[in-house]
Amino acid sequence: MAIETLVKTIFSDEFRKERWEDLNAGKLLDPQFKKDMKFGDEVDVQFHDPLTMNDYEGGDLDISTVEKAGTSTVKVKINKGKSIFFKLDEAKLDQIKNAKTDNEKIKLVKEYSADAREQFDRAINKACCEQRIRATMLENNRAITISDTNVHQVFASAKTALVKGDGKGHTAWKDGEMIAVISPEMEAFMSTMKILQYSDVMAKHYKKGFVGMFMGFAVVVDNNIDKTTEVVSGENVTYEYPLFGRAKRTIAGGVQKDFKLESGKKVGGFDTHYWGKGVFGVKAPLSYLLVSAKCLVKFTIGS
């Protein structure tokens, strides 16, 4: 197989794989890969219904008394995209060509094209962070100035809201599957307080971004946490919005499956250039499944 063809094939195969463990905020996403998607399309995505709890007052239960559970269809607008460009110089191409085994060639291709895929992953993470506008806001949308004395209260309030759910018997909480997505600054507060409990099991499960457990949440750090800037008393103040929800059960997503790379060399050039584009869309279909808070986080030495 020609090296250019090998690069395109391996990259496309990697792109189609679900990279859930390599996402940060995207761990809240249930991504479904779709073929033949275009920017601006609206696609049907199957989304898992929430858990249901009802009062039990005695007697037998049968199918007529059980509320339907399973999946529901969510309309997701494909309104996000990322163009991808990378190049391989002759030295890298020769290294791939001269690899002793096919597995070594594949490993090198993955290594040299990894940054392009990571850029797409970051775009998905950012889109998930932006879904905080659908979240149930804590403290009536008033800003909470994070300190070492109240950071635990944000988690407690988020947990309470998720357990309560919609107040009609649907809860958004399930032990062992809850995620908190926070900024590096908020993690700094929690780390200095030594309240994060590390878990080898959870670290292997969640992988990228995982920093520990707290109050039933697997805490994941994301640099792209959503932020807004407001003028307060004549000064610009930046607020950030941590997210709290259930892994793979909070945000619905449609992601392009049939990603195709093009390749070519510039006139007179030696490097092989690769380019392509991928589209996707995300949506938090039920606001009570996602909780956020408007936080002012300023970590300094001595905080």
Predicted regions and their residues:
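Extended, solvent-exposed, turn-rich assembly/linker loops in the middle of proteins
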Residues: 136-210
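Short acidic, glycine/tyrosine-flanked loop/strand segments centered on an H-E-D-like triad
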Residues: 72-102
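Active-site-surrounding "flap" and adjacent substrate/cofactor-binding loops of secreted or lumenal enzymes
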Residues: 50, 58-72
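Generic alpha-helix structural propensity
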Residues: 40, 55, 69-71, 81, ...
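Glycine-rich, flexible loop segments associated with nucleotide phosphate handling
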Residues: 101-111, 170-178, 210, 236-243
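Sequence/fold signature of self-assembling virion shell proteins
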Residues: 2-29, 36-39, 44-53, 77-79, ...
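Alpha-helical scaffold segments that mediate packing/assembly in large oligomeric complexes
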Residues: 97-168, 297-303
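Short regulatory "switch" loops immediately downstream of catalytic or recognition motifs
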Residues: 91-97, 160-165, 222-230
